[in-house]
Amino acid sequence: MEPRTPAEWKTLFESEAFARQTEYYGPLGAEYTPAGTHLRLWAPTAKQAAVNLYRRGTGGACVGTLPLQQQDKGVWSIYLPGDQHGKYYDFTLTTPFGTCNAADPYARSAGVNGVRSMIFDPARVDPQGWERDVRPVIPPARRSVWEVSVRDFSQDPASGVHTAWRGKFLAFTQQGTTLSSDGIHPTCLNYLKRLGVSYVQLMPIFDFGSVDESRPLTRQYNWGYDPTNFNVPEGSYSTDPTRGEVRVRECKQMIAALHGAGIGVVMDVVYNHMYRSDNVLSRVVPLYYFRQNDDGSLSNGSGCGNEFASERPMARRYLIDSVLYWAREYHIDGFRFDLMGLYDVETMNLLRAELDKLPGGRDILMYGEPWQGGCSALHRYEANKNNLNMLNERIGIFCDNTRDAIKGGCFDAREPGYVEGRPGSFWDIGASVAAWCRSEKLPPHAPGQIISYVSAHDNFTLWDKLLMVRYARPEFAAVDKTALAQNRLAAGIYLTSMGLPFWQAGEEFARTKKGQGNSYHSSPALNRLDWHRAEQFHSLVDYYRGLIGLRAAFPRLGALDKAGPAAIEFFPLEQPLVGWRLPAQWGDGAAWSALCVYYNPTETAQVVTLPGGSWKLLSDGISSSLWRGSSRICTGQTVLLPLSATVFGQV
């Protein structure tokens, strides 16, 4: 008997019998050849299915409707003879829930707003030279991640980017950009190369529904955590969203340009939910892809009205297929999972194993947010912080323990952290240095599982947070010397800690959103990178640049095994000072035989005694590039500047 209620459908979908009858691991989507194209759709509850063909991605009448043939395992298929390159299509499906039109869940490109899927020949769409694009080899010691939205990166009129490319994929391809084209102060890709960051994490670049691609973008803005088509690049980031091949080509051009600069690309992926409950997956197989409560209603652990059921076999297959597609076809270097706590541990470990099978796949980064956006009906082990020791050691998490210890809680603007003088937080600073490998609070397999950070796109920027803790009515545009020192100290802590350092784009030039803690659909002007600040706060930019280089010169800070954290020697200093020593690993090419690091969160100078031997001053609270030159050699007692991270190298 056919189920009648959502609860009965839930029982069916989670039964072993349904899995046996419908699990399918053959090809899905459009399989193109010049001689013809196979279309295959997994829709086991459908009673009828047809494909509608169009010449254009938007507008224009349907030029033909053809029935699909039902195959085994819930698959419907049709063969379209002849060269179908450039054709668009959707499906008409009749299920127990009614009749509707749906795009292809496995579509690789689409027309405006992702309504119609596109058939195309990759060889005719790929940019010139794409076959020569390779992922840059980035050793652990050099790894650092800079997070940005495609839109924010170049929307500023002063970015020096061509007007037509601002806020687009192609902005990343323009060489030699400078502030207002002054020829002096680098911006965009030119700036990133000078900064020395090794990965750019791109906020969602697959097709999302919160920006209307058919309308001008001047007053539209969204971060894009509202997925519509998981395997299709976002059209508003292309120069022509009406032509499906353009978004594919220009996305690849962006990736190739970053790779050409030696920078890896991390893709922010949002499989945990879809933009609306009425979406392509729910139209093709109603209810199957989304987690349900016991009464059959949709679980809402995402806070967006639905959550992806990663534990259901064909949903799991879909997620893994999609990630592997981006890794293979777009040469993506890493994946950041939004609300990773909504996925089950088994799925994430299976995905890691599949990525590892790809050429160079073991170097593809994989990490995520180890929490949820609400109560979830997931009854298996969640891929969250509590189950970190169940995840593969090369699946990392954003460490909110480190974030909150350094700068204070993210939900209370006035709550201070270590850099603002919060008593007692120094214990967590020590744990952060060792990537929590020596703490009972959070036992990772290895330091590589910990993302050390203080700011990301969510919540207040670091600069805004520092000012809001200090002042009841902060002047966000002002140059505040105390906040600058605290900013340098915060960076000095997480960039000398073990784990993978990560920061929000513009943190290094005091990025402000004027106290707005959730700017996901605020104005483009509020969200965009203000490239004038990169020049105004050039000394802060240089401080980050120096720390990035210093970290690379001492490879053990980026070590992936637990031997590094175990080798850290903490000094018995008076609170709230933190000091530690780490010997270099034999044969790793370190510039110094050991590092000695001190953090002083007080607003007065402090005197400490160095361990025995001679120590070169590498970085203090003002400059992080002393290590590049012949700075002074210290022994015995030394003075720590107020609000400073001070680093010495043993010589």
What is the role of each PLM region?
Residues L41, F91, V148, L202, ...:
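Conserved, mostly hydrophobic/aromatic
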Residues E31-K47, A567-T609:
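Carbohydrate-binding surface patches
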Residues Q21-G26, T496-Q516, L526-L595:
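Glycan-recognition and catalytic regions of carbohydrate-active enzymes
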Residues R151-Y330, L339-P359, L365, A377:
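Substrate-binding/active-site clefts of carbohydrate-active enzymes
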